UniProtKB/Swiss-Prot annotation:
Feature: compositional bias, Polar residues: 403-423
Protein name as catalogued: Gamma-aminobutyric acid receptor subunit alpha-4
Tissue specificity of this protein: Expressed in the brain.
Annotated NCBIfam families: LIC (TIGR00860)
Keywords for this protein: Cell membrane, Chloride, Chloride channel, Disulfide bond, Glycoprotein, Ion channel, Ion transport, Ligand-gated ion channel, Membrane, Postsynaptic cell membrane, Receptor, Signal, Synapse, Transmembrane, Transmembrane helix, Transport
Record lineage: Eukaryota, Metazoa, Chordata, Craniata, Vertebrata
Stretches assigned to the Cytoplasmic side: 281-284, 342-515
Annotated organism of origin: Rattus norvegicus (Rat)
Any single GO CC term annotated in Swiss-Prot or TrEMBL for this entry: GABA-A receptor complex
A Pfam family this chain is assigned to: Neur_chan_memb
Region of interest (Disordered), residue spans: 353-436, 448-470, 486-513
Domain comment as written in the entry: The GABA-binding pockets are located at the interface between neighboring alpha and beta subunits.
Gene name of the record: Gabra4
Signal peptide coordinates: 1-35
Length: 552
């Protein structure tokens, strides 16, 4: 009985053990099957091929996702790898970006062990992609070196990520009224070319604030500072419908260093140089003329060169106003010198006329006639006296002179003439009449004629001149006669008052400082300094940043 009862117990224990072993084996198999399947799939790319083939089987890339149904939403974001350059002349800017688009296409859902299918650009042409274009783009280039720079990924739930590397040249409208203290908001506008908002819309992937990324190292510009960016969206109406347009505004502020060195400082120095001429003597006409003309030409050159870096706008910029005012100061300095020179010449001419103006004139002809008559009467009395004295001398010394040869007639006659000049000479010296000296020649001639008549021929037919009383008186009388002749010869034409004109007054001198120069030395610098103060305070304190449409 004992042996019969033990056999069923052993059989029961062995059955339980087998059941436990079977459960453990099953659990082990279940735990190892996912790993084995994934390992098999990694080792077998044919599985991916089957997945892709199944996705594209019956897929029509001509139809948008949800065609005839809900609106397709395309989420976008931009990563800027390089910003610039910015051209003021062409009013455009260039940047290099990664442009990302994300949408959901339920036709591309799949079931598989991999969450994301990372594919190359070959898959892009086989599926539907948004027809995004840049509305204000002048030129957009997709990079293809060394292969097309495109990224395409399909997620298990049918979400598509499509990324391209683009270089975009976009238009940037600029209003240069405040140039070069200006700021601009350069837009980048993109949207669908064919699908209106009833079929496709655009949104920002990470929200308006973080969907556009511009690293600091990517925004280093020469003439501008990129101070930020803002985003917005708008709806544009056309004859084909309403379209959603996404816009990114890149806010740029111009750097002034280049323009200060190239334009502002040279203009200020040129104006100061033109005002140096106020301190130069007004008689230095060449020096002041060179100052004026040189500074005017310099300002002309600066104004032309300043416009080379700007488009040909029809309005005046802030720099144009500054250059125009500087040019006005320089030109006014030249006009100021012209005024100084003009008024100085007028003053000198007035002074010369005042000095050279003769005293009030009296009738000259009667006076001269009266003086001439007086002189003739004096000469007549002198001739009579001379004749009387000559006759006395002839009678008193006839015996002595009878032995004198006729050959000495000329010398004795000359001596007699010299003696006859004593009375006229004394009369000329004592006479206050200035015309008596001028008529000395006539007096001498009359005396000579008297001597000739006194020396009449003798009864014997010989010429008997009237000699002087003594021979010692002849030299002195001859010397006096020579002085009288010299006086007559130096007087020139008879009737002249004097051979040497009276000393005239010196011409008026134009030396000294003009009142206009004195006023200009103060007025010009003060006015120019006040202009600079107002100019820089207004423009530096003014908000010259152009407002974007999203902030208006």
């Amino acid at each position: 009985m004992v042996s019969v009862q033990k056999v069923p117990a052993i059989v029961l224990c062995s059955g339980v053990s087998l059941a436990l072993l079977h459960v453990l084996c099953l659990a082990t198999c279940l735990n190892e099957s996912p790993g084995q399947n994934s390992k098999d799939e990694k080792l077998c790319p044919e599985n991916f091929t089957r997945i892709l083939d199944s996705l594209l089987d019956g897929y029509d890339n001509r139809l948008r996702p949800g065609f005839g149904g809900p609106v397709t939403e395309v989420k976008t974001d931009i990563y800027v790898t390089s910003f610039g350059p910015v051209s003021d002349v062409e009013m455009e800017y260039t940047m290099d970006v990664f442009f990302r688009q994300t949408w959901i296409d339920k036709r591309l859902k799949y079931d598989g062990p991999i969450e994301i299918l990372r594919l190359n650009n070959m898959m892009v042409t086989k599926v539907w992609t948004p027809d995004t274009f840049f509305r204000n783009g002048k030129k957009s280039v997709s990079h293809n070196m060394t292969a097309p720079n495109k990224l395409f990924r399909i997620m298990r739930n049918g979400t598509i990520l499509y990324t391209m590397r683009l270089t975009i040249s976009a238009e940037c409208p600029m209003r240069l009224v405040d140039f070069p203290m200006d700021g601009h908001a350069c837009p980048l506008k993109f949207g669908s070319y064919a699908y209106p908002k009833s079929e496709m819309i655009y949104t920002w992937t990470k929200g308006p604030e973080k969907s556009v990324e511009v690293p600091k190292e990517s925004s280093s510009l020469v003439q501008y500072d990129l101070i930020g960016q803002t985003v917005s969206s708008e709806t544009i109406k056309s004859i084909t419908g309403e379209y959603i347009v996404m816009t990114v505004y890149f806010h740029l502020r111009r750097k002034m260093g280049y323009f200060m060195i190239q334009t502002y400082i040279p203009c200020i120095m040129t104006v100061i140089l033109s005002q140096v001429s106020f301190w130069i003597n007004k008689e230095s006409v060449p020096a002041r003329t060179v100052f004026g003309i040189t500074t005017v030409l310099t300002m002309t050159t600066l104004s032309i060169s300043a416009r080379h870096s700007l488009p040909k706008v029809s309005y005046a910029t802030a720099m144009d106003w500054f250059i125009a005012v500087c040019f006005a100061f320089v030109f006014s300095a030249l006009i100021e010198f012209a005024a100084v020179n003009y008024f100085t010449n007028i003053q000198m001419q007035k002074a010369k006329k005042k000095i050279s103006k003769p005293p009030p004139e009296v009738p000259a002809a009667p006076v001269l006639k009266e003086k001439h008559t007086e002189t003739s009467l004096q000469n007549t009395h002198a001739n009579l006296n001379m004749r009387k004295r000559t006759n006395a001398l002839v009678h008193s010394e006839s015996d002595v002179n009878s032995r004198t040869e006729v050959g000495n007639h000329s010398s004795k006659t000359t001596a007699a003439q010299e003696s006859s000049e004593t009375t006229p000479k004394a009369h000329l010296a004592s006479s206050p009449n200035p015309f008596s000296r001028a008529n000395a020649a006539e007096t001498i001639s009359a005396a000579a004629r008297g001597l000739s008549s006194a020396a009449s021929p003798s009864p014997h037919g010989t010429l008997q001149p009237a000699p002087l009383r003594s021979a010692s008186a002849r030299p002195a009388f001859g010397a006096r006669l020579g002085r009288i002749k010299t006086t007559v010869n130096t007087t020139g034409v008879p009737g002249n008052v004097s051979a040497t004109p009276p000393p005239s007054a010196p011409p008026p001198s134009g030396s000294g400082t003009s009142k206009i120069d004195k006023y200009a030395r103060i007025l010009f610098p003060v006015t120019f300094g006040a202009f600079n103060m107002v100019y820089w305070v207004v423009y530096l304190s003014k908000d010259t940043m152009e407002k974007s449409e999203s902030l208006m």
